[in-house]
């Protein structure tokens, strides 16, 4: 029996001190026990909540983002040779407008990727999806709600930054909504629209190459070590892990 347990028993079960002091001690012990239990439960809930947020972020963005003044074709060959890298997908990003049939529009970031990989690479919950003959795009639930859009609706994508110099009109292309996703954290549901590569090339006339590469690693990989390996093999690269990109969010959660 340790010293603290011995003192507690002497205090609680000493027959010479039956009365208010014993009752007060019992209430104090119960109070401390309940407080400790509540703290343990709160920490457990927060840890579980943090874990879910991490899964959502990694599922939407990947483990690592690679960018910078690099040769993307050569960089992708290098990534293929790194054992810890399970998968990657290059992308082009551009802020533009999405417009519904009533000419209501919303400014949003277009992410041009190999659209056939949107469901296999990104771990996103789709509340609706379907296949169509027209080029398909995928957008968030909030964006769809604000523009009153559903799967199968036709919309127009416009890129004001790539407007025709002669006519002064932005490039515009018609596509169809192939899926609506629901990420449920941050502003992801109203932040990005995934569009096909060929649509991106037609829309972003002033873009000359990729903007970055989303990278997926193994489940228990050491991201810091993988980041160092990539930096050593790819010159002039700018690399960020998911924790670095969202450092402020998780710092605030841990306060």
Predicted regions and their residues:
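N-terminal Sec/SRP start-transfer signal
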Residues: 1-36
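Short amphipathic alpha-helical coupling elements at transmembrane boundaries
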Residues: 6, 10-13, 51-62, 247, ...
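Conserved, well-folded catalytic cores of nucleic-acid-processing
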Residues: 11-15, 56, 60, 158, ...
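Residue-level recognition of specific faces of alpha-helices
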Residues: 22-29, 45, 56, 109, ...
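Hydrophobic, regular-secondary-structure patches
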Residues: 37-109, 129-133, 231, 238
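Short aromatic/hydrophobic contact patches that present stacked aromatics
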Residues: 63-65, 136, 212-214
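A structural signal for hydrophobic secondary-structure junctions
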Residues: 81-208
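Mechanotransmission and gating elements of multispan inner-membrane complexes involved in transport
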Residues: 169-255
């Amino acid at each position: 029996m340790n010293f603290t347990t011995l003192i507690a028993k002497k205090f609680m079960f000493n027959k010479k001190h039956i009365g208010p002091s014993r009752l007060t001690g019992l209430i104090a012990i119960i109070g401390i026990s309940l407080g400790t239990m509540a703290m343990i439960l709160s920490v457990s809930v927060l840890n579980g909540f943090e874990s879910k947020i991490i899964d959502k972020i990694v599922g939407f963005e990947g483990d690592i983002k690679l960018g910078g003044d690099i040769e993307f074709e050569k960089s992708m060959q290098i990534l293929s040779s790194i054992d810890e890298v399970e998968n990657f997908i290059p992308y082009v990003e551009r802020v533009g407008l999405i417009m519904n049939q009533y000419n209501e529009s919303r400014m949003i970031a277009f992410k041009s990727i190999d659209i056939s990989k949107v469901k296999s690479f990104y771990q996103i919950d789709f509340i609706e999806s379907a296949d169509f003959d027209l080029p398909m795009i995928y957008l968030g639930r909030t964006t769809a709600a604000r523009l009153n859009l559903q799967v199968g609706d036709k919309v127009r994508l416009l890129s004001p930054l790539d407007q025709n110099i002669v006519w002064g009109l932005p490039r515009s292309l018609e596509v169809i909504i192939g899926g609506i996703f629901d990420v449920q954290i941050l502003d992801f549901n109203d932040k990005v629209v995934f569009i096909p590569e060929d649509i991106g090339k037609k829309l972003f006339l002033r873009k000359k190459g990729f903007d970055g590469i989303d990278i997926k690693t193994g489940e228990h990989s050491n991201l810091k070590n993988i980041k160092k390996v990539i930096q050593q093999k790819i010159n002039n690269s700018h690399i960020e892990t998911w924790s670095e990109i969202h450092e402020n969010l998780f710092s605030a959660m841990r306060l």
